[in-house]
Amino acid sequence: MGDTRAHALLVQMLGAKKTLEIGVFTGYSSLSVALALPPDGKIVACDVSEDWTNVARRYWKEAGVEHKIDLHLAPAVETLSQLLADGEAGTFDFAFLDADKDNYDTYYELLLPLLRPGGTIAIDNVLWSGRVIDPEVKDADTVALKELNQKLHHDERISLSMLPIADGLTLAVKR
């Protein structure tokens, strides 16, 4: 979780007010982002686990940021699709993706139109403990990450940087 300070710094550098998080778990990343947001900042947080997000809610409340976080307990594809249907395209400043790896590409394609130009998607675990460079590793998560890394490298819609922070953090900035 060493990259949460990077998330907070990115949010501040972007002047972000409206953010997305795909994959909440215990809320560590969303807490870091919420603390970095201005008083009127918001996070739309997506997760499917009520058990883990209950832990997150306790931390958010204790830190006094629960009012900044709109938790959606539903598959992220549904939430992101609904945001697009509701006319939210181009209105988000920052998104953090750390969820089921085999759906990263689907999430990416739904997140990108939600971002404003200059908005940034931070994608976690892109190095996957080095497995993404091992041609012998062919499990679904590793293959999905390898394919996404290649796709992002060639995607003309973004500017790209892969940072060796924690387990690899890709920054995709919408052009």
Describe the function of each predicted region.
Residues 1-175:
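S-adenosylmethionine/decaboxylated-SAM
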